[in-house]
Amino acid sequence: MRTLVKGGDIVAFNEKSHEIIRDGVVVFENGMITFVGFSYRDPVDKIIDATRKLVCPGFINTHVHPHANAGDYFRNDPGKKDYFGSNYLTYLTPKKGAKRPPDLEDFRESGKFGLVQAIKNGSTTIVIYGGGAEGEDDFVTMVGELGVRAYLAPSFRNVDFYYEGTGALRYVWDDAAGEKGLQQAVTFIQKHRGSYNGLIQGMLFPRQPDTCSPELLKKTRNAARELGVGIQIHAAMNLIEFHEILMKYGKTPIEFLHDLGFLGPEVILGHCVFLTGHSWTALPRGDDLKLIADSGASVSHCPLEYAKLGIALESFDRYLAKGVNVSLGTDTYPLDMVNEMRIASLANRLIEGDYLSGSYRDVFNAATLGGARAIGRDDLGRLCPGAKADMLIINLCKSEIGAVFDPIKALIEYGSGRDIETVIIDGKTVVDRGEFKGLNEAELLSRVQAEAEKIWEKVSGWDFLGRRAHEISPWAFPLKKAR
């Protein structure tokens, strides 16, 4: 079926960069864009009126943990002060002898909820970090039926963590677990890659440099080459990892990966915040950014997650100036790429002390072209003939946004994912008039709330001090209930 989108401001790609075509048209057929321009005279089967709206490429969200909503409340202000804002350690690490937090009791609810929100907020391609470890066939079915373009496979590592009763963090090494996890991921990719009309693709996900042995990382690199897939690893993501690698190998995490021969164009470095020269690392010597740029590896920047902790890249502009390809990810909730673009820009301006830095052009490119480059796809993140028909129609004619001079600036400065009315993936409309097609969102939210409340009730079972949820993360104001 041939579909024509007409009348909006089209963010078109001219083979070099994005440009705006006012009152333009986009034509797509069989999941591919066939025409972008000012007028189209051939017959079409369907017309979508985008008059006075913004039509842009779907966002490529390169780092997502979709099931993490219930745990987000324990990752930010209640973090352990002696762990330098290493947020995931405060919630995901249990006390000795305890089971891991059951935040995946029913991934079909929490995971589905997270992915739905990401899609509604404009993510048409999602890198699901570690997806598929639990009930892999059901997970792939759930992702595939949502109609999103996804890169996924179970993550793996050699290490498990636990806390002593004193709060001391302990690493427990298990080389066999890492080897087994890698093989499970390889088998997963071989089984599921290319399913759902090619929407499901694979990627290897070793967890962190401090939780994977050099041998496991080398085997991961070799497996990726044999499979022809990319790799993403959380790297330079927190100071625990940074100092652990520095003490163990005398290198930064980036130097460690570089010297292993791990870095390359197929590799995405998740977060990649704590580098030489960063104010938190107190290590001015060395040039991690040059190593990344020279290797061709990409960075998945998740600005909101770090802004919550008072941390930022130093800086987005410096990474670009060094030649590093930067993409954007949401990491955890609220999974809104428009918000991530805004935070990326504002955080950069604060770090640089320069209101002209962190341009909206650059952060929009990171959410589209940067993401496409990171996953090795020159048919995504752009609207041009030959590209996949992944696009968004965004309503900027709202009092919350006001008069629109530049639609991209208006979107990033004043808009949000809630302004996205239509999401088209592979030529199919997945979100229409702001509603996810074929899904009762209210019922899903109700089930997710019930699941989250069960998780919160069990927090004391794995917290190293046995604290309840409200003790770990106190309410903003005291709660009073009727007796």
Regions found by a protein language model. Give the residues of each.
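Divalent metal-coordination and catalytic microenvironments
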Residues: 8, 26, 31, 52, ...
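N-terminal metal-binding scaffold of metallo-dependent hydrolase/deaminase domains
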Residues: 1-42, 53-55, 474-479
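Metal-coordinating catalytic core of metallo-dependent amide/deamination hydrolases
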Residues: 140-278
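His/Asp/Glu-enriched, well-ordered alpha-helical/loop segment
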Residues: 259-266, 314-398, 413-416
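C-terminal cap of metal-dependent C-N hydrolases
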Residues: 388-445
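Alpha-helical scaffold segments that flank or form the walls of functional sites
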Residues: 74-149, 181-197, 449-454
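Active-site gating loops and adjacent loop-to-helix segments of metal-dependent hydrolytic enzymes
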Residues: 72-107, 159-176, 239-267, 279, ...
